[in-house]
Design a protein with these regions (language model features):
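N-terminal, active-site-proximal structural segment of metallo-dependent hydrolase catalytic domains
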Residues: 1-47, 57-63, 78
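Active-site-proximal beta-strand elements of phosphoester/diester hydrolases
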Residues: 1-9, 98-110, 142
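Structured beta-strand-rich core segments of catalytic domains in phosphoester-bond hydrolases
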Residues: 37, 43-109
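Active-site beta-strand termini and strand-to-loop segments that position acidic
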Residues: 70, 94-97, 221-222, 247-251
Length: 251
């Protein structure tokens, strides 16, 4: 079973940059998208063989997630927790027979960490939500999680020490999640792989120089790890400032 997660940075723009051709070649069972920036009624394209689920922000052209899945889920829910988390279209949960899939676009802490307090509340509430799901069946949690967990996960850790996405507070929240029974699949399989990034700034020729960050993840319940065949990053796929990340599971 192949699952793909990709922050497309605006799906309408990505559609003009080869998105449908990518989907055909990727042959994924599940495609999770973040930052779609569109509503379902704007999706004027065909993706044969997939059930499509959308969660759009109240604010037009902002945030948003989608899940395209060949296997019809048992149930699909949108957002989680308190009302404060229910206006930006950031989470879709699909329940399958043997696991929950959670597609997430984590809020950015913003310049000068202006939104850090909200981010911390989000992380605590989402971790509680994931643990509630995990008590029922294993969880596959994926998306743009807006944090580089370790120094190996970005090109320039020292100069980004207190920037959004690499603050001590954000990294500590990821550590807490991984200490509560979840596994970062890519880093578990490739603990020493350097230069493996999923996002690059649009400035300073960052992508050409591979001056990137690994902020897109597949994180799974620890007991699901025996089913993990591979977890990878596909930096050769363009169309967004992020690239897709992939998880392959045995059936």
């Amino acid at each position: 079973m192949r699952l793909i997660s990709w922050n497309v940075n605006g799906l309408r723009a990505c559609l003009n940059k080869g998105f449908l051709a990518f989907c055909a070649l990727a042959d994924a069972d599940v495609i999770c998208l973040q930052e779609t920036k569109m509503r379902p009624e704007q999706a004027q394209f065909e993706l044969e063989g997939y059930h499509r689920f959308w969660n759009s922000a109240d604010k037009a052209g902002y945030s948003g997630t989608a899940v395209f899945t060949r296997r019809e889920p048992l149930a699909v829910t949108y957002d989680f927790g308190e009302d404060i988390h229910r206006h930006e279209g950031r989470v879709i949960t699909a329940e399958y027979e043997d696991f929950f899939l959670v597609c997430c676009y984590t809020p950015n802490s913003k310049d000068q960490l202006a939104r850090l307090d909200y981010r911390m509340a989000w992380e605590d509430d989402l971790r509680e939500y994931l643990l509630e799901l995990d008590a029922k069946k294993p969880v596959v949690y994926c998306g743009d999680l807006n944090v580089a967990h370790q120094e190996i996960d970005l090109k320039n850790p020292q100069s980004n020490r207190m920037n959004p996405g690499f603050s001590d507070e954000e990294r500590d929240k990821m550590t807490q999640l991984l200490s509560s029974g979840f596994v970062d699949t890519f880093r578990a399989l490739y603990p020493k792989r350097t230069g493996a990034y999923s996002w690059w700034s649009c400035r300073f020729h960052a992508r050409e120089n591979n001056a990137g960050w690994r902020i897109d993840y597949f994180i799974v319940s620890a007991r699901l790890m025996p089913r993990v065949k591979n977890a990878d990053i596909w930096p050769e796929i363009t169309g967004s400032d992020h690239c897709p990340v992939v998880l392959e599971l045995t059936e």
